[in-house]
Amino acid sequence: DSSFKYHLMSAKNNGVTRAEIAEILTHAAFYAGWPKAWAAFRMAKEVWANEDDGADAKARHQNEMAFPIGAPNDAFAKYFIGQSYLASLSTEQVGVYNVTFEPGCRNNWHIHHAKTGGGQILVCVAGRGYYQEEDKPAVELNPGDCINIPAEVKHWHGAAPNCWFSHLAVEVPGEGTSNEWCEPVAEKTYGILR
């Protein structure tokens, strides 16, 4: 059934790993029955067929850049679809962080507020990802690309569906700065990106 395959692909694009889908289908087999589960396992095997072992892909991505991937970004996990990582590079004068996104991971729409100054600068350092402002088309980001985000602009950024992505996030100094986290990026918005 192609509709089930679509749901499996959506799960993969939203960060569900091969190991996690195997656990989910194993659990479901006790309720739906093993014959149906085996059919689901075959479809899942097709969807995750070209996926590298996550540890190998992560190690290859780390080798593409000089900055550390960092630790799982658990403090902000509720504002992300998929797994992100955070490495603090500097907190003096200007905050600089390396943010890494697993394939398909992206943050929610958000706004960097400021009374004066503020905003954020993104510098892509490895992989491939996207940045999008509200009511504008998404912009593909590759190593060396730089995005200047003024304060008060609603936007999101994250990895391409099948590629790791890392960017430096530079906090632009300002007065009265704060972040407002908004809704997740709609699947129809993200789903058209490759």
How does the language model describe each region?
Residues 162-181:
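A short hydrophobic beta-strand segment most commonly corresponding to one strand
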Residues 101-104, 141-162:
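Conserved metal-binding segment of the jelly-roll/cupin
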Residues 1-60:
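Hydrophobic alpha-helical segments
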Residues 97-116:
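Conserved short histidine dyad/triad with adjacent acidic residue
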Residues 57-97, 108, 178-194:
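A short, N-terminal "cap"/entry segment at the start of jelly-roll beta-barrel domains
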